[in-house]
Amino acid sequence: MGMPKVAALSRKRILVVDDEPFVCDAVKMMLNFDGHTVETAHNAKEALAMFEEGKFDLVITDFAMPAMKGDELAAAIKARAPNQPVVMITAYAEMLQSSGNPLKGVDFIISKPFLLENLREAIAKVSPSESREKDE
């Protein structure tokens, strides 16, 4: 009987940022499947405006975007809310991780292509541990 309660606890309000609308739509569809509320932005400027207006449990951003890259967006978000979890989705994950320069403001990196399971893992890793401890 505890399963629905854990699922309800873990529902998040998530901001997804990607300059490719189809990627935003795909991520939104996957996250909606798990009961999360998702809003999308197609660039960093739009994302920052939305972030200022609303409280999000998590921000998921692409790395390679015009004007402001995902790590720059993450740093700008952390400057406003230091504890805000930020996950980055990128085709450049291995290159970025092996560069030796940690990405400021990024809590977790997902490699493209990705599956719903990768999103679930990222959400679990960056979320406060209260709901995970009950499972263990």
Q: Where are each of the predicted segments found?
A:
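Two-component/phosphorelay signaling modules centered on CheY-like receiver
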Residues: 21-39
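Active-site beta3 strand of CheY-like receiver
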Residues: 54-60
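Receiver (REC) domain active-site loop signature in two-component systems and cognate sites
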Residues: 65
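Non-catalytic signal-transmission and effector/linker regions of two-component phosphorelay proteins
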Residues: 1-13, 117-136
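Acidic catalytic/metal-coordinating carboxylates
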Residues: 42-46, 69-73
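Alpha4 helix (beta4-alpha4-beta5 surface) of REC/receiver domains from two-component response regulators
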Residues: 72, 93-110, 116-117, 121-124
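Conserved phosphotransfer cores of two-component systems
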Residues: 52-54, 76-84, 101-104
